């Protein structure tokens, strides 16, 4: 089988969340960080025939890049990558070294929904980098919800700071849900977004079967 560019993109994103991944037979990929404060699940076009434990996902992706448009044969203990006369045997890790992602869909607690475009996500990531922002602040005030990216007042001692703002729409209640920038590791795409009173943010892509659950700062008020 060949691994599509879309699936490689997802694996690259997952590698920023956790260096290891345990792939079950089928077409579902899932990951979480060690805390866990980030969880993600994706449905891909490939059908993995066996259980695949990869301890160093960056190394596996590097091997794929090295072999180019190769065929990958996922066997019981190894993956065999072939391209013309070239071949690589990539040995799986011991499954005990790779923790399986636990994806449990929370129910209830939703209090605000909005939509992010692919461009919104890219701009949010750029703004966080440009302003060295520690958090993304989702603020509901006077019936208007806004995403604010800058230095929170509590950390800035009320001095002026550069701030990027994105109006998200109308809201019922006041809130301040803070998502640490370090957990906002999402692939730019179009997303339906849900903020939850259990202090997390949920994103579901509208263009591909990809979902994220991101934990908020415990000091958030909702």
Model-predicted regions and their roles:
Residues 102-107:
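Secondary-structure "cap/kink" motif recognition
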Residues 1-93, 109-222:
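DNA polymerase processivity clamps
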